[in-house]
Regions:
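Low-complexity, intrinsically disordered regions enriched in charged/polar residues
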Residues: 1, 23-27, 49
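Sec-dependent N-terminal signal peptides of Gram-positive bacterial secreted proteins and lipoproteins
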Residues: 2-22
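Sec-dependent signal peptide cleavage junction
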Residues: 16-34
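Bacterial extracytoplasmic/cell-wall-associated proteins, especially those involved in peptidoglycan
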Residues: 29-161
Length: 161
């Protein structure tokens, strides 16, 4: 594992989630007012507003009907791939890597990017603050895919490491 230093600007969060429930927004304000440091061993991962938008759009397109946890797990896959030696080390490159996310090729991503829910943004911020699962690298809908070792099913998605 690597050390991840994240700086999340409060203004970016509030801009992205202006209609979020006040209690959640208040909690996030407290959690993002200063530098967030996640201890994992060795490098800094700079997360831009564009990265956050991309991850939220993927979460929306791939797990729009899977609830907050389903979206968080999709974001985990992206972040875990960034950390993996087997995938590109940047969020945008992971997302646009050929044949990885169905929504990129079927038009779902383009539809989602203009209509990202507050819940999808919350999933991204929650995972940046505290990952749900550090091991999952793949997911498919309907059954376990041909890649990776099956780990578990969450609603309609099957996750592998």
């Amino acid at each position: 594992m690597r050390k991840v230093n994240l700086i999340i600007m409060l203004g970016v969060f509030l801009t992205c989630t202006s209609t979020a429930k006040a209690s959640y927004e208040d909690e996030m304000e407290l959690r993002t007012m200063s530098k967030i440091e996640a201890q994992e061993s060795g490098y800094s991962l700079g997360v831009t507003k564009e990265d956050i938008d991309l991850m939220a759009a993927i979460a929306e397109a791939e797990a729009g009907n899977q609830g907050l946890m389903g979206k968080r797990l999709v974001v985990d896959v992206i972040l875990n791939r960034v950390d993996s030696d087997y995938f590109p080390g940047e969020i945008e490159k992971v997302i646009y890597q050929p044949n990885q996310f169905t929504c990129i090729s079927d038009g779902g991503f383009e539809k989602a990017i203009s209509n990202i829910s507050d819940e999808s943004y919350a999933a991204v911020y929650d995972e940046l603050l505290e990952r749900t699962d550090h091991d999952i690298l793949f997911f498919t809908a309907g059954n376990y895919g041909q890649y990776g070792i099956p780990v578990y099913q969450y609603q309609d998605h099957f996750f592998c490491r």
